[in-house]
From Swiss-Prot:
Record's subunit section: Homotrimer.
EC number: 2.1.3.3
An annotated GO BP: arginine biosynthetic process via ornithine
Keywords assigned: Acetylation, Amino-acid biosynthesis, Arginine biosynthesis, Mitochondrion, Phosphoprotein, Transferase, Transit peptide, Urea cycle
Organism expressing this protein natively: Ovis aries
Regulation: Negatively regulated by lysine acetylation.
Post-translational modifications: Acetylation at Lys-89 negatively regulates ornithine carbamoyltransferase activity in response to nutrient signals.
Location in the cell: Mitochondrion matrix
Keyword Ribosomal protein: no
The keyword Nucleotidyltransferase belongs to this UniProt entry's keyword annotation: no
Protein's pathway: Nitrogen metabolism; urea cycle; L-citrulline from L-ornithine and carbamoyl phosphate: step 1/1
Name of the protein described by the UniProt record: Ornithine transcarbamylase, mitochondrial
Positions with a binding annotation for carbamoyl phosphate: S91, T92, R93, T94, R95, R142, H169, R331
Active site: C304
Length: 355
């Protein structure tokens, strides 16, 4: 107890001697009042989280980024913990951000590909979940089918995190929102303009944007609209939160007045055989300065990467309005926050950002 109190006093004294720090009283291992409790939960889709719970993960992301990147602190919050990483699909940002982030916090990530493990093939999903539960503290799985994640979560006794599935990509959206909060200072009232495929990224935005008070304007080619059941739920969220949701097949209509222009790959992993058909269907959906002309004066651009020139031209992608590289970096801070929130009792020290 004496050591903890002394450490607290030294931490507070050091912070008071800083210049631009805004902090709350902080005591290691002691939750702040009214702290959101996420420990032990799964993160399969943002549909399962309230606006306050998502905001808490973003707050924790900002806190870790500030303490580690700006202040240079070492925070071994995951020391002694291990993470199983199951990847059925290739990855750059998801793998790098998770491996480096988990290790930076003192934990041990273990990467498994389809050469190492075959979900439901060489071993049942039930057996895999139980074995992983006995050897790791959490699992991040990047899979083809959301249903596989659901089974893993049902059978495992440890948190399961969706690293991407056919329906959702929640950890990408956390990085997007952190990036927008850093740029605009707040998320409430922003209009997001989605121009592209009705895919897992869009689904995750639809399950969360209204909870922040953000409006969403979606343009997809005919036949490539978002999942109808997800659209129905998104309409309910918009009604509950007093936000607007519109769907169209006209890219300029969706871009009109938008603060944030967002697109993604037109051809996701597993859709390579549809390439010719999709390229034809998405003609006219490239984000260009012509698209930006009808957007809000303060427009910015997001793309989760990797990017192809037919999706967005160089003029927009490499412009000062493009936030794609800060967005990519924030994948690391947000996945770190997810792991800390699901595996520890740590409370943010930084003042809560405005959302």
């Amino acid at each position: 107890m004496l050591f903890i109190n002394l450490r607290t006093l030294l931490n507070n004294a050091a912070l008071r001697n800083g210049h631009n720090f805004v902090v709350r009283n902080f005591r290691c291992g002691q939750p702040v009042q009214d702290k959101v409790q996420l420990k032990g939960r799964d993160l399969l889709t943002l549909k399962n989280f309230t606006g306050e719970e998502i905001k808490y993960m973003l707050w924790l992301s900002a806190d870790l980024k500030f303490r580690i990147k700006q202040k240079g602190e070492y925070l071994p919050l995951l020391q002694g913990k291990s993470l199983g990483m199951i990847f059925e699909k290739r990855s750059t940002r998801t793998r790098l951000s998770t491996e480096t982030g988990f290790a930076l916090l003192g934990g041990h990530p273990c990467f498994l590909t389809t050469d190492d493990i075959h979900l439901g093939v060489n071993e049942s999903l039930t057996d895999t979940a139980r074995v992983l539960s006995s050897m790791t503290d959490a699992v991040l799985a990047r899979v083809y089918k959301q249903s596989d994640l659901d089974i893993l979560a049902k059978e495992a006794s440890i948190p399961i995190v969706n690293g991407l599935s056919d329906l959702y990509h929640p950890i990408q959206i956390l990085a997007d929102y952190l990036t927008l909060q850093e740029h605009y200072g707040s998320l409430k009232g922003l209009t997001l303009s989605w121009i592209g495929d009705g895919n897992n990224i869009l689904h995750s935005i639809m399950m969360s944007a209204a909870k922040f008070g953000m409006h969403l304007q979606v343009a997809t080619p005919k036949g490539y609209e978002p999942d109808p059941s997800i659209t129905k739920l998104a309409e309910q969220y918009a009604k509950e939160n007093g936000t607007k949701l519109s769907l169209t097949n006209d890219p300029l209509e969706a871009a009109c007045g938008g603060n944030v222009l967002i697109t993604d790959t037109w051809i996701s992993m597993g859709q390579e055989e549809e390439k010719k058909k999709r390229l034809q269907a998405f003609q006219g959906y490239q984000v260009t300065m012509k698209t930006a002309k009808v957007a809000a004066p303060d427009w910015t651009f997001l793309h989760c990467l990797p990017r192809k020139p037919e999706e967005v031209d160089d003029e927009v992608f490499y412009s000062p309005r493009s936030l794609v590289f800060p967005e990519a970096e924030n994948r690391k801070w947000t996945i770190m926050a997810v792991m800390v929130s699901l595996l520890t009792d740590y409370s943010p020290q930084l003042q809560k950002p405005k959302f």
